[in-house]
Structure formats: C-alpha cells, structure tokens
Regions:
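N-terminal accessory regions of S-adenosyl-L-methionine
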Residues: 2-133, 302-303
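Conserved alpha-helix/loop element of class I SAM-dependent methyltransferases that forms part
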Residues: 137-155
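Conserved class I S-adenosyl-L-methionine
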Residues: 155-165
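Conserved SAM-binding loop of SAM-dependent methyltransferases across substrates and taxa
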Residues: 166-178
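S-adenosyl-L-methionine
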Residues: 196-215
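A short SAM/SAH-binding and catalytic strip from SAM-dependent methyltransferases
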Residues: 220-233
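A short, conserved alpha-helix within the catalytic core of class I
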Residues: 230-242
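Conserved beta-strand signature within the Rossmann-like core of class I S-adenosyl-L-methionine
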Residues: 246-257
Length: 305
C-alpha cells in the first residue's frame, strides 16, 4: 500500500513537471512546508446543523482558533482540515481561472495586487505571467470580474453575501470597489473570523454586527457554493429575506448535498426568483454546477468558454 502511494505520487509529480516545469516541484516543497494539522486536543463543542461547514467540528475548531489565536490566524489557510472545506482550489483549476481572467483583458493593478496576497499562508502555485499566487485568489478575482461585467460598477451598491468563508470575495470587492454596505451572512464564528481577516488586510467594511438581521432590500446578493449547501429551512429564510428582496444576484449552485439534506434545487430556485436564468459556470468545477444570475445588463461580455 505504501509503495503504491509513492508510485502514484511520483506519477503525479511527473505529470506536473511535464505541464508546469521545475517550478511545480518547488511549489510542492514550499506548500509541504506550510501545511499543518489540527492537534487532537483542540475540539469545538459548537455545531450548526443545516449546513456542511457548520456541522464539521474540525472546520469550526480552526475557525474559532484562528479568530482568537493570532499564531493560528497567521497560518489557518494551510491547515489540512480547513482545506477540506475551503482553500482547496487545485493548481489546474487555478490555471483555468487565470485563463478566464486573461480573457477579460489587462487586469487592473488592484486586481493583480489582490491575486498576489499571501495573508494567512495559503497554498500557492507558479503561473506564467503572474508568479506564485493562491488559486483561490484567482477564483475570487474571476468572480469579481464576472460580477462587474454582468452588473456594472459596484460603487454605492448594498451587497449581501451568503456564505462568506474567511472573506476572500468581500476582500476583492471592497478593495477594488466601494459598496455602500456589505452584509456578511454566515454562522457567527465565521463572520467574526472574516471581520478579523478583512481588518488584517486594511479593510473596514460598512456592515452591521448581526448576521441574522436583514435590511429591507439589497442591490446585489452573492453566494459562491454556499446557498446550495444549506438546509431548506435556512434557504427559505434567506430566500424570503434576502434573495427575493435583491435587485440582482450571482449564485453558484452546486449539487454537493445531493439527497443528504432536503433543500431547494436549482430548477425550483429559478422558478421562484423572477428574472433568474441559468448560465454555464466557467470553469466548470462540478459536473452538475450552475451559475444563476438575475438583474444583469447582458451576458455578451462574460467569459463563457
């Protein structure tokens, strides 16, 4: 078994070397130095039923530790257990995001600045034309440019994000644009970590302190692989109080729950959200993934291949 793992590892390394050259070996060494695992003595007692991440004890433990312990905070993105939930965009998918970014033309200095952020020690890979960057940052940047192409300037908009991770999408949006409000909607532990992360990169969001209270309306709602990963009860609350009160929307829908939890599937979602349409997710990160949008200007300028 051990020999087989070594053989598989060597085959993978050879494939990477043929595709990306010597830099791929250096990347793996450096990422191998960064990666770490949670001590078995650290266990959270907190559980949030109704979502994949909220019910994962190891993930919630890392979130809580990163928010309260600055040493953990400085490296939480490279934690093995955390990467099972977030920060798991691989090298090849990162290249696809970069290809899509390049199709949008010359990237602004602030977008490039964001892509190169190394805060909290994510895995990074070498890409031609941009250097060693986190593939997750490339994804957030590509989604930002999608949103800008679909909806125009985000300046002055009241934005709500459902499922905020550690604040990667909020980071680039508030770095490059100036929303009048950015509502973070997630479990309390995640919102606390997100606010700490955004503060660490010099961003002060105009938001409120309660992720359970909602404004009368929003100009844009965003959800990347999150709305589709929660139970119907929570979905109905968000649908009623956020989505149906938002003029525009960008929701990446996945099928990770399948039949594990009763939830609103994508066809029901578009039937209930006026003006919503399904377009192809680029790059496609899951065979049944869909991108749902509404309130958009046009999809003519959107990268679609």
């Amino acid at each position: 078994m051990y020999l087989k793992r070594i053989q598989n590892r060597l085959r993978k390394q050879l494939k990477l070397y043929k595709t990306y050259g010597f830099a791929s070996l250096i990347d793996d060494i450096l990422n191998g130095i960064r990666v770490w695992s949670l001590d078995a003595n650290h266990k959270t007692t907190t559980i949030h039923e109704g979502s994949i991440s909220g019910a994962d004890k190891a993930y919630l433990t890392i979130v809580e530790l990163a928010e309260t312990d600055n040493q953990i905070f400085q490296k939480f993105k490279s934690n093995r257990q955390y990467r099972e939930i977030l920060e798991h965009v691989d090298r090849d998918t990162g290249q696809k995001y970069l290809d899509a970014l390049n199709e949008y033309g010359n990237l602004s200095p602030k977008v490039v600045e964001f892509c190169k952020f190394d805060q909290c020690k994510p895995f990074r890979y070498s890409y031609y034309g941009i250097g060693r960057v986190s593939p997750s940052n490339l994804r957030y940047a590509k989604i930002y440019l999608d949103i800008q192409m679909l909806f125009g300037s985000l300046n002055g908009m009241r934005i709500a994000e459902i499922g905020v991770g550690y604040g990667g999408q909020a980071h680039i949006i508030n770095l490059v644009s100036k929303p009048s409000l950015y509502k973070l909607i997630d479990i309390p532990e995640v919102v606390k970590l997100t606010l700490k992360y955004l503060d660490s990169v010099g961003l002060k969001l105009i938001t409120d302190d309660n992720s359970e209270s909602f404004s009368d309306n929003y100009d844009l709602v965003i959800s990347n692989y999150a709305f589709s990963e929660i139970s119907r009860e929570i979905q109905e609350n968000y649908l009623r109080n956020i989505i149906l009160k938002s003029k525009r929307g960008y929701v990446i829908y996945n099928d990770i729950l399948q039949n594990q939890v009763e939830s609103i599937k994508v066809q029901e979602f578009i039937a209930r959200v006026p003006g919503s349409v399904i377009i192809k997710e680029i790059p496609l990160t899951g065979s049944k993934n869909n991108l749902v949008i509404w309130g958009h200007q046009s999809i003519n300028g959107l990268v679609q291949s």
